[in-house]
């Protein structure tokens, strides 16, 4: 027997009567059923103010397209890297191979997951525990973090896109991920069945993961000949070069691997100026751990603005991209849609409540490539964003973000360590407070 009371007939009748008694409800129903909620709720007065003009713009060329995949974190990190590479090679347009980066991220994740789970199995972790079930359900998603991307580039480098192009399975990752997930689930089941054979099970599963990835994505190059003609028409030839050498030569000057990830975790128990991390989150075993320095949102804004204005390079960030997004026109603002007016409902959660009660978390990574500052030189009005959803939407793929939306829905940025004050540099040397694997601060890596 359950003690949850059912919805009674009288209650249902009252709901229907109350709805039909309101002319607003009838008009809203007619409009939304015909046009959809976003078109009906769109705030015209706010939308017309979302101008695409900025006082500082970093030109990064044609917008890339991640297609039907969750590789935003790789695309956005490589978009930062390609800006540096284009400057160093004198190119107007250039793309790194996102397929190459994903190949080695997935291969490393297979190894990381198996050895992480093996430790738990050997320690007696029950197969039906919350932790084990979370790890099993979360395995082989496409998401990731800045630090995880840098771990891949440090170990494997990068290659130009035309030397390891997209495949059907890199653009549409669902089927391949299902097969990898099934293979890993089978391996874990075998570990529980025979713990004495765990090492052999891991070796077989890593080999299987390599086969699956190579069948779907192709075999990545170990070295290649690189030739190009720069924007001034001058021909260049590097000769044979490895992916690691290529990365170091054309991106190494920016020292992206040493960047620090700043987050705005709004929950009061997580103190600003302290490091936090997520248990069991990573890809390259032996690589840098996925840790963040928790700071005020305004400090993140100040860092991004300083980088754009003084260094002139894109800035990687993670956000909850869904709320108040006009995808077609490429705009985010906290009042861009008036859903509450249409429904007669108050959506009054603040940022901390949205995180705590599962309403918001990081789910998309992009790059800031512009900012608009008022005449006073202090007030930021809007931000220009390089997305990775192709150039057929928004301003040829570039989005406009209001400053108040940054406050509410941007959670993370990657910045040079040199921008941090002494107290934050000291905090980086202290151990991180580790949060459980299912904490929302790790959601971008799903």
Q: Which residue stretches match the model-derived regions?
A:
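Short His-Asn-centered micro-motif
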Residues: 75, 317-320, 369
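Catalytic nucleophile-His microenvironment captured as a short glycine-rich beta-strand/loop
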Residues: 72, 153, 356-390
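Generic recognition of flexible, low-complexity loop/linker segments
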Residues: 290-293, 301-307, 353-358, 367-375, ...
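Active-site nucleophile-adjacent alpha helix/oxyanion-hole segment immediately C-terminal to the catalytic cysteine
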Residues: 47-315, 377, 383, 393-396, ...
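Conserved catalytic-core surface of thiol
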Residues: 374, 378-446
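Long, positively charged binding patches that form subdomain-scale interaction surfaces
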Residues: 287-363
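Helix N-terminus capping/helix-initiation residues
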Residues: 8, 36, 97, 242-243, ...
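N-terminal regions that are enriched for targeting/export leaders
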Residues: 2-61
């Amino acid at each position: 027997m359950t003690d949850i009371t059912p919805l009674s007939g009288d209650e249902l009748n009252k709901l229907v009567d109350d709805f039909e008694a309101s002319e607003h409800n009838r008009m809203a129903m007619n409009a939304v059923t015909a046009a959809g909620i976003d078109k009906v709720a769109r705030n015209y007065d706010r939308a017309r103010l979302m101008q695409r003009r900025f006082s500082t713009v970093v030109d990064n060329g044609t917008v890339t397209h991640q297609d039907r995949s969750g590789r935003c974190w790789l695309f956005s990190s490589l978009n930062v890297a390609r800006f540096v590479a284009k400057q160093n090679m004198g190119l107007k347009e250039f793309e790194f191979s996102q397929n190459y980066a994903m190949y080695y991220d997935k291969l490393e994740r297979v190894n990381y997951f198996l050895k992480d789970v093996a430790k738990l199995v050997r320690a007696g972790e029950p197969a039906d525990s919350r932790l084990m079930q979370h790890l099993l359900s979360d395995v082989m998603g496409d998401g990731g973090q800045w630090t995880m991307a840098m771990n891949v580039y440090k170990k494997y480098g990068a290659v130009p896109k035309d030397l390891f192009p997209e495949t059907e399975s890199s653009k549409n990752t669902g089927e391949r991920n299902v097969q990898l997930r099934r293979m890993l689930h089978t391996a874990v089941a075998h570990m529980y069945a025979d713990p004495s054979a765990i090492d052999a099970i891991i070796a077989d599963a890593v080999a299987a993961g390599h086969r699956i990835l190579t069948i779907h994505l192709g075999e990545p190059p170990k070295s290649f000949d690189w030739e190009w003609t720069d924007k001034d028409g001058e021909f260049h030839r590097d000769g044979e070069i490895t992916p690691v050498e290529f990365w170091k030569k054309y991106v190494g000057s920016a020292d992206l691997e040493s960047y620090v990830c700043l987050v705005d975790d709004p929950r009061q128990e997580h103190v600003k100026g302290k490091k936090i991390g997520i248990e069991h989150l990573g890809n390259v075993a032996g690589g840098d751990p996925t840790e963040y320095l928790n700071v005020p949102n305004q400090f993140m804004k100040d860092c991004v603005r300083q980088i754009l204005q003084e260094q002139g390079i894109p800035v990687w960030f993670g956000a909850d991209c869904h709320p108040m997004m006009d995808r077609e026109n490429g705009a985010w603002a906290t009042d861009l849609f008036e859903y509450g007016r249409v429904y007669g409902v108050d959506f009054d959660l603040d940022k901390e409540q949205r995180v705590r009660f599962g309403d918001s978390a990081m789910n998309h990574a992009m790059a800031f490539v512009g900012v608009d500052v008022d005449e006073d030189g202090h007030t930021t009005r809007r931000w220009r964003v390089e997305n990775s959803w192709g150039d057929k939407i928004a301003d040829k793929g570039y989005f406009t973000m209001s400053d108040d939306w940054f406050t509410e829905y941007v959670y993370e940025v990657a910045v040079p360590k040199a921008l941090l004050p002494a107290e934050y540099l000291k905090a980086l040397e202290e151990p991180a407070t580790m949060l459980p694997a299912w904490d929302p601060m790790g959601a971008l890596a799903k």
